Amino acid sequence: MQIYLVGGAVRDQLLQLPVYDRDWVVVGSSPQAMLAAGFQAVGKDFPVFLHPNSKEEHALARTERKTGVGYTGFACHYAPDVSLEDDLLRRDLTINAMAQDNSGQLIDPYGGQRDLAAKVLRHVSPAFVEDPLRVLRVARFAAKLHHLGFTVAEETMQLMAKIVQSGELQHLTAERVWQEWHKSLSTNHPEVFLQVLRDCGALAVVLPEIDRLFGVPQPEKWHPEIDTGIHTLMVAKQAAQLSDSLPVRFAAQVHDLGKGVTPPSEWPSHKLHCHTGLNIIESLCERIRVPNEFRDLALAVCAQHSNIHRADELKPTTKLKVLGLLDVWRKPERLEQVLLCCEADHRGRLGLENEPYPQREIFLRAYQAALGVAVQAVIADGFHGKQIKEELDKRRVSAIEAL
């Protein structure tokens, strides 16, 4: 029985990135031998075991053969005679197909080190096309490693386009699409995930709501970049620079989906996009099972971002109404999240990336002023029932007016 560290842990170690999960491959063993050695069986589809002490996953070396559609349509073969090289050959990218033995010796049969040095994401073998999930995984790795200068090899991009054309992407489950998108949100460059998917034609299949934004014009006066799709990528980039919050990054990426359904006769104006975008966000989130926390923030940003951009023009009553619609009295963290998305939207425009966003301060001050009005004081002054809310709002408006 030989045990090797494999995959992402080896890659990230060589890139001097933090290693969070360590996966191991066991060569020359069997399920019976693993159980006898004290390992605990956990694999449903193929033999994976937890180490008795570290609880890290150890998988028996295996090969895979395509038997059906989608990323689950594989037959696994595992046996003591499956070599480490056989196991590494079935992996997606050369930089993920390296192993390390217990003495620290690197095993790299498919040129992973060469591609690490060249900063290239390249498929290991032509069998890459058999698993549609790899399209999303490569896009995510492109986002994860973009800050180091990594790009997708042209021939790998061609294979990704081939997977898209085969129709296999349609067999990905909603959960897997969300899982990869969600992971991409935690990278330094989430916009690269969307860009790579668009470059190979996958965005139109997995996230058509975002794909249809490309080619839709906006008024050049406000949007020098003109194209709504390009604006969305720029906003995604700005949101990642402004905030580590994944719901904020998600909401920023979907805030303008309503522009994708504006009739061309109305272009470049999008007067109703804050309204039309709501149903699109609802159905997108339902389709790929986006958690409520992400959905609710996205809906709030979609509905109110245009109002917040006009903060200096709004009457005190309107500012208070917007704060109420954002539910900030019950969810005080919501305002900061929405304002971050709006700032990303404001800066996600060509040549305006470093533009200040005074609207943020205007709304924060309005919120603090309104918050300073105590409901207890209203009750103490003898107001009852519905009168309490009316008087509270009146006093809050006065507090905002006094700024």
From Swiss-Prot:
PROSITE patterns: HD. SUPFAM superfamilies: Nucleotidyltransferase (SSF81301), Poly A polymerase C-terminal region-like (SSF81891). Its cofactor is Mg(2+); Ni(2+). Magnesium is required for nucleotidyltransferase activity. InterPro entries: CCA_bact, HD/PDEase_dom, HD_domain, NT_sf, PolA_pol_head_dom, PolyA_RNA-bd, tRNA_CCA-adding_enzyme. Mg(2+) binds at D21, D23. One of its GO terms (molecular function) is cyclic-nucleotide phosphodiesterase activity. Residues 228-329 form the HD domain. ATP binds at G8, R11, R91, R137, R140. Its EC number is 2.7.7.72, 3.1.3.-, 3.1.4.-. It catalyses: a tRNA precursor + 2 CTP + ATP = a tRNA with a 3' CCA end + 3 diphosphate; a tRNA with a 3' CCA end + 2 CTP + ATP = a tRNA with a 3' CCACCA end + 3 diphosphate. Monomer. Can also form homodimers and oligomers. Catalyzes the addition and repair of the essential 3'-terminal CCA sequence in tRNAs without using a nucleic acid template. Adds these three nucleotides in the order of C, C, and A to the tRNA nucleotide-73, using CTP and ATP as substrates and producing inorganic pyrophosphate. tRNA 3'-terminal CCA addition is required both for tRNA processing and repair. Also involved in tRNA surveillance by mediating tandem CCA addition to generate a CCACCA at the 3' terminus of unstable tRNAs. While stable tRNAs receive only 3'-terminal CCA, unstable tRNAs are marked with CCACCA and rapidly degraded. Belongs to the tRNA nucleotidyltransferase/poly(A) polymerase family. Bacterial CCA-adding enzyme type 1 subfamily. Comprises two domains: an N-terminal domain containing the nucleotidyltransferase activity and a C-terminal HD domain associated with both phosphodiesterase and phosphatase activities. HAMAP family: CCA_bact_type1, CCA_bact_type2. This is Multifunctional CCA protein. It comes from Vibrio cholerae serotype O1 (strain ATCC 39541 / Classical Ogawa 395 / O395).
